């Protein structure tokens, strides 16, 4: 990711899955992710809400939205198949909420970068509360709506390999909402694809899909959860 490029259109946003081959200068900078200037902090306990509603892929993020159901991006899910595994709210070497197999993948039919996955309820490797997925995680709820200047947070796994799968929280504000696109200034990096965007009540208003990894950027993007998108997601939540 070249940080000197000015992104001039939403179509040019870089997707935020983590990639190998990052040069040494970028790695050195990203190792300083949790500093005050970026408004990024490492999550101290991923076993409490809302942090226990976030899951990790090997190079991206997702979050729980209902029984055995998680949301991420299409550009994340395209690299996965039924039977592949996700990890519930890992916390570096402190443990995680269990490892689970993907049961089904349903991409949103429009252009929006959303994918819904159903997860096998029984873990391959158990979490602290046993083998049941729903006992080790807590689903996030939809926000009714959102508006410009609302305070938000993004929770996820930026640069997961480099950061040893530690969870981070980034705070900022909504800069604009147009149709199903939400722009915000919270700091994000590769690996944040699929992260939930939460309001001050820890309700989810969208899913991160891209940005430029620059402090103060107002071009970071998420799919805003319109009524139509919420309806699609609700239909794919396991009953």
UniProtKB/Swiss-Prot annotation:
The keyword Hydrolase applies. The active site is at residues 75, 113, 193. One of its GO terms (molecular function) is serine-type endopeptidase activity. Pfam families: Trypsin. Keywords: Hydrolase, Protease, Secreted, Serine protease, Signal. It comes from the Bacteria. SUPFAM superfamilies: Trypsin-like serine proteases. It is an enzyme of class 3 (hydrolase). Its EC number is 3.4.21.-. This is Serine protease SplC. It comes from Staphylococcus aureus (strain MSSA476).
């Amino acid at each position: 990711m070249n940080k000197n490029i000015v992104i001039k259109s939403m179509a040019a946003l870089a997707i935020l899955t983590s990639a190998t081959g990052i040069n040494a200068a970028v790695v050195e900078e990203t190792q300083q992710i949790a500093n005050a200037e970026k408004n990024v902090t490492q999550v101290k306990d991923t076993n409490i809400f809302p942090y226990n509603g976030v899951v990790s892929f090997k190079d991206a993020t997702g979050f729980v939205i209902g029984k055995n159901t998680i949301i991420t991006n299409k550009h994340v899910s395209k690299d996965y198949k039924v039977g592949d595994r996700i990890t519930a709210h890992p916390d570096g070497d402190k443990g995680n909420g269990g490892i689970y197999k993907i049961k089904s993948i349903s991409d949103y039919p429009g252009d929006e970068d959303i994918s819904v996955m159903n997860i096998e309820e029984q873990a391959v490797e158990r979490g602290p509360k046993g083998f049941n997925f729903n006992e080790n995680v807590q689903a996030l709820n939809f926000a009714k709506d959102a508006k410009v200047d609302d305070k938000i947070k993004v929770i996820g796994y930026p640069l997961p390999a480099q950061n040893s799968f530690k969870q981070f929280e980034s705070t900022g504000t909504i800069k604009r909402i147009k149709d199903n696109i939400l722009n915000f200034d919270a700091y994000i990096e590769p690996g944040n694809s699929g992260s939930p965007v939460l309001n001050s009540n820890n309700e989810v208003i969208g899913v991160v899909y891209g940005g430029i990894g620059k402090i103060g950027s107002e071009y970071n993007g998420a799919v805003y959860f319109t009524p139509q998108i919420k309806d699609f997601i609700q239909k794919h939540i396991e009953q």
